[in-house]
Design a protein with these regions (language model features):
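N-terminal binding-site loop/beta-alpha segment at the start of enzyme catalytic domains
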Residues: 1-76
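Conserved, mostly hydrophobic/aromatic
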Residues: 6, 18, 34, 41, ...
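Active-site mouth loops of central-metabolism enzymes
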Residues: 21-32, 92-105, 133
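Short, acidic/polar
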Residues: 29-41, 100-117, 162-171
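Aromatic/hydrophobic pocket-lining residues that form the small-molecule binding cavity
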Residues: 34, 60, 106, 110, ...
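Beta/alpha (TIM)-barrel catalytic core signal, keyed to glycine-rich beta->alpha loops juxtaposed to Asp/Glu
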Residues: 57, 129-322
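Structural motif corresponding to the early beta-alpha repeats
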Residues: 71-101
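Active-site groove signature of glycoside hydrolases
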Residues: 114-133
Length: 322
């Protein structure tokens, strides 16, 4: 495992971290298997774990806390997230701060997460949704400053809305935000335009999430793919989006080098960018851990391949242009 500096915090974090969205009772997860996967990740050098209260209403945090207690003495960095008070995803400018992140709510859910994790301090507390319409509101600013001063959190980050990579820049300019978590993968390259350069220039850590585009870049997506009732991928991969995704995968697959599979290529693409501090694939089984962590070996992609992957950028979202 290789490590990178996590922005201004100075932490040395594993460049492949652990995304825990799939744990805590979501998408058919199994607690025993999840714990085995977490154990295996620690054994292989993973030390950055990203969870949230919303992942099973504390269940994912509980599993992580249980794992950390079983590995006392191991350096591990814990990142979690505060849900918006109105429990609406994504964040929108029309929502007021009192409806999303009033000070008492920020404190309440920080204390809840500390309880589920069994910790006295959270390394990285993040806003789970965001709109830059809230950036200059001093209520959330004072709240996070108080949490830092009291030692309840060490640093503060923002999880950026999907396909809205610039909808955080005003918040970053306050100087209060230590990290951003953003969707960044072979298809979703928009963060390279403004966000990643800004973070690199200002020593702000970058957590690249959704490295496999919700599963399309695992190489297992087909026209017949189905998911359990209630799994949000049924909405994400609706008929039109599924068809478009499969078409793009057909064009991408010839670029996968011999001896490498698509998931490994997807991770290596992300790690090519120097602004990225860590990427957080979801890993519910030990086999997932072993498959993903192999990409952290310092081997660079050939420049010609990197250039070819750039052509697979897919601008998506409400304001996207082809």
């Amino acid at each position: 495992m290789r490590y990178r500096t996590f922005g201004r915090t100075g932490w040395q974090v594993s460049e492949i971290g652990y995304g825990m969205w799939g744990m805590g009772g979501w998408t058919g997860s199994d607690d025993e298997e999840s714990l085995k996967a977490l154990d295996r990740a620690i054994a292989l050098g993973c030390n950055f774990f990203d969870t949230a209260w919303a992942y099973g209403q504390g269940r994912s945090e509980t599993l992580l806390g249980q794992t950390l207690r079983a590995h006392k003495g191991v350096t591990a960095y814990v990142a979690t997230k505060i849900p918006p008070k109105n429990m609406k995803w994504p964040g929108k400018a029309e929502y007021l701060v009192e409806d999303t992140y009033p000070p008492d709510h920020i404190r309440e859910f920080t204390e809840k997460s500390l309880g589920f994790l069994g910790l006295q301090t959270i390394d990285l507390q993040q806003f789970h949704v965001w709109s830059d319409a809230w950036a200059d509101d001093d209520r959330w600013q004072r709240a996070v400053d108080d949490l830092k001063r009291e030692g309840l959190v060490r640093s503060v980050g923002i999880s950026v809305n999907r396909w809205e990579a610039t909808n955080v820049l005003r918040a970053l300019k306050t100087g209060l935000i230590d990290s951003v978590q953003v969707v960044y993968n072979i298809f979703d390259q928009a963060p390279e335009d403004e966000l990643l350069p800004y973070c690199q220039a200002n020593n702000i850590a970058v957590i690249a999430r959704v490295p496999f585009d919700e599963g399309s870049l695992t190489g297992t997506l087909t026209a017949d793919s189905t998911w359990p009732d209630g799994d949000w991928r049924n909405l994400y991969f609706n008929r039109d989006h599924l068809t478009a995704t499969l078409t793009r995968l057909d064009r991408l697959s010839p670029l996968v080098p011999e001896g490498m599979d698509l998931p490994e290529l997807a991770l290596r693409f992300i790690l090519e960018h120097p602004a990225v501090s860590t990427t957080i694939p979801g890993m519910r089984r030990p086999a997932h851990v072993e498959r993903n962590l192999v990409a952290s070996d310092g081997i660079r992609l050939p420049p010609r391949l990197g250039d070819a992957l750039k052509t697979h950028r897919w601008n998506r979202g409400p304001n996207a242009t082809p």
